[in-house]
Amino acid sequence: MTYLAVRNDLQLLTARELEVLQNLVNGLCPVEIAKELFISVHTARTHVKSILLKMNAHSSLEAVSLAVRNGMLPTPLTA
């Protein structure tokens, strides 16, 4: 996927989906994302599914890789 395609895909994401994607980049799973964002696990999983559809990704890892590789989101936080 090209930089422009990823950029366009990220523009389709809602603010909340971008938050969820950033948490995926930081290594959180949907259960942890739910706790972090004060939402239900079901809602977190729904956001992840929506992100995958909009980014045409087959997994969370692929979505994270596309976003980070193309410089669309900051790299994961390191300790």
Regions found by a protein language model. Give the residues of each.
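Basic, Lys/Arg-enriched C-terminal extension of HTH/homeodomain DNA-binding domains
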Residues: 53-79
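Conserved short-loop catalytic and cofactor-binding motifs
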Residues: 8, 25, 36
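Short amphipathic helical patch at the helix-1/turn junction of helix-turn-helix
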Residues: 23-25, 42, 68
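Hydrophobic alpha-helical segments, especially transmembrane helices
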Residues: 17-18, 46-50, 70
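Regulatory hinge/linker segments at domain boundaries
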Residues: 1-22, 74-76
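Recognition helix of helix-turn-helix DNA-binding domains
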Residues: 29-62
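Hydrophobic residues on short alpha-helical segments
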Residues: 21-25, 52, 64
